[in-house]
Amino acid sequence: MPQYVHTNNSSFAIPYNGSWAHLSYFLSAGHTTRKWVRDGGFDILHLHEPETPSLSHKPLVMHDAPPMVATFHASIEPYPRALRLFTRYLRKYLSPLREAIFVSESAQKTAEHYLPQQVGIQTIPNGIECDFYRRAEPNPQWRGNPEAPTIGFLGRMGEERKGFTVFAQAAKIVHEAFPSARFLVAGDGQEDGEKTLDAIGADKGLRERFEFLGRVSDADKARFYRSLSMYVAPQTGGESFGIVLAEAMAAGCPVIASDLDAFRAVTEEGSSAALFVNRDANDCARRMTELIEDPARRQSLSQAGSIRSRSFDWNTVVDEVLEVYAKALS
C-alpha cells in the first residue's frame, strides 16, 4: 500500500443501482476522516460521490474544512421516487461544495436532482493512461487470428447490468456460423457465468470455446485488450461513462457496445465503435459477425477508437481538473 494511501476501518455493502455500493458510516470512521482532513493541512479537498452516506460525506459537516470539489459518477434513470425524499437533505449537506465535476452528461442529469444551484459545474470524463494500454504486449495464448478470432468480455458476471447474458446469447449465435471463434471472459463470477451458459442451453462445443480468466491484474487487463480481435461491452444500464470502452480503444481493440447514452457519448455516437440495440443479443451477434467478416472494418474501428481515446488521457484530463481547482480556490 503506498504511503499516501490512508485506509479507514471496514465497510459494508448494500445493493444499489444494479450493483453493490460499499459504505463506511461508522462513528469511528467519521472521527478518523475528520482528523485526517485537519491534520493534512490540505489546500483543497476533492471528494467522490459525497451524496452517499460514506467517507466522502464526512467533511461536508466540518466547519474548518478546506475548499471542496466533488466528482459525481452515478447515473440512475429513471431517478427513483424514494430518493426524491432526500433531496432537501442532500441540497443542504452538499451546499459547502464550491465546484462539481460530472464524468458525463448522464451523471449530471442524476446529480441535478440534489445539487445546490450555487455550486459551479463542469463535465470532465474519467481519465486513463493511454500509453499504458497502447504499449501492452499481446498474450499469445489470448491472441486471435483470422481463423480463430477472440471476442472478449470484461466484468462481473453475477451483475445483470454488466450484460454477460446478452454476451453469452450472442456468442451462441456466432458460434453456429464461426465454430472456431473463442470467447475470453475476464472478471469475477465464473460460477455465475457457467450458470448463464446452462440457462441459454450452451452445448459442449460452445462451452469449449469459452475461457474464463478470472479477475485479472491491470497489466493483464491491458494485454487482454491488446490480444482480442474485438471487445464487447454489453452493459444493460446503470453506466455513467464506460471506462472499459476507453481502455479498449486506447489499446487499439475494435469495440462493440450497447447503445446506452453513456456509451454513445464515449464513442461519439458510434463513430469509434460498433453499437447495437441494448439487450438485443441478435443485434450484438450481427455486429460480431460483421467484424469477423470484415478485417478492414476492424482496422477502421481500431484507428478511430485509438484517436478517440486520447480525449480521456490523463495528460488532457488533469489540466481540466486543475482549472476546476483554481475556480474553487478563487
Question: Residue ranges of each PLM-predicted region?
Answer:
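Membrane-proximal helix-turn-helix segments that form the acceptor-binding/catalytic region
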Residues: L83-A100, H113-Y114
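Carbohydrate-associated surface elements
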Residues: S106, G127
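A conserved mid-protein helix/loop that constitutes part of the nucleotide-sugar donor-binding site
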Residues: G158-I173, N282
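Nucleotide-activated donor-binding/catalytic signature segment of Leloir-type glycosyltransferases, i.e.
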Residues: K195-V216
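Short alpha-helical donor nucleotide-sugar binding micro-motif in glycosyltransferases
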Residues: R215-V216, R223-L228, I243
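Short hydrophobic beta-strand element within catalytic cores of glycosyltransferases
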Residues: M230, P254-A257
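Conserved acidic donor-binding segment of nucleotide-sugar-dependent glycosyltransferases
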Residues: E269, A273-A281, E290-A296
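A short, well-ordered alpha-helix in the C-terminal region of glycosyltransferases
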Residues: D283, R297-S311
